[in-house]
Amino acid sequence: MNNFIVKESPFRPLSEVISLSPIILESPGREHELQVRVSAPLIGTSLPIIIFSHGFGSSMDAYAPLVNYWAARGFVVIQPTYLDSRTLIQNPKADHSEAIRAYLESPLKAKMWRFRVEDLKRTIDQLNLIENSMPGLKGRLDKDNIALVGHSFGAQTSATLLGTRVINFDGSLNEDFADSRIKAGLLLSVGGCGGEALTPFAKEHFPHLNQSYEKMNIKTLVIAGDKDLSPLTVQGPEWFTDAFYNSPGANQLVVLSGGEHMLGGISGHLVTETTDENPDRVLAVQRLTWAYLVSALYPENSAWETTCSWFLNDPNQQGTVIGK
């Protein structure tokens, strides 16, 4: 048991954070080498692991508001860079729209979701290599307590290893990628169910969004914004709550009042892709995510209950929490 985490609260940092990147993982046949960033607290042992999957076009260098928060409070956070990252485009100033354009023009776009899943599995498979590559980390990981976290496309990537199944064009279920090594999940702005909920654009270019959550059995927190309007669905913001209502594993849902797709700015400070910049909203996401994962991995810990009380009694009325 990690006393470093269990005895503390999400309201103050416990340690300085050290980060190392890039660590190169073995990835035979991959177009680009698989790079990861690792962030860890300077002190503590038996540290649980978060593997974070970035959103479309992003990279291992993003999401500092979340990553640094978690690492300062006892988690080792590992961030792979996936092949859709704009950092891999032959343009050092490529923005999000250029990443989308590159994806739409790629003959491999239909397989991109699967490449992400393969890279996520590679990352889990090579935890020993990661541990040995970062000075001061060896012997400090709790490899029995691994959580998957993702935002947007990254949430879909994480959900696939939590048990979500992509539905093929003929209606059959794609391969089952559920991984028994994973103990908890956290899905931020995750796409909902497919079928007629998808726009024609989504059906053509993002067929992996035709998915079923019926076999997602691992305990998971879903966080969505009630103002998240997406060109991928004909539904409204409620589409981003499907993972909670349609899976047996998702046991908590947080809906953020006024939240859009970036949930106040979780991908970075003052980044252009954030349309709902709100430091208080980011703070809520930081605290709620940390607390959920701690209580999910260490059931004797009351961090989730304590943090929900803080959130629901906030005079700013930032949102709601629904459990099942």
Can you say where each PLM-predicted feature lies in the sequence?
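Short beta-strand element of the alpha/beta-hydrolase
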Residues: 46-55
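The feature captures the conserved acid-bearing segment of alpha/beta-hydrolase catalytic domains
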Residues: 172-255
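Short glycine-enriched nucleophile-adjacent loop
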Residues: 128, 155-168
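Short amphipathic alpha-helix adjacent to the substrate-entry channel of hydrolases
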Residues: 61-90
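N-terminal cap/lid segment of alpha/beta-hydrolase-fold proteins
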Residues: 1-45
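Conserved alpha/beta-hydrolase "nucleophile elbow" surrounding the catalytic nucleophile
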Residues: 54, 150-155
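Alpha/beta-hydrolase active-site loop
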Residues: 97-143
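Alpha/beta-hydrolase-fold serine-hydrolase catalytic core, especially in secreted/extracellular enzymes
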Residues: 258-261, 266-324
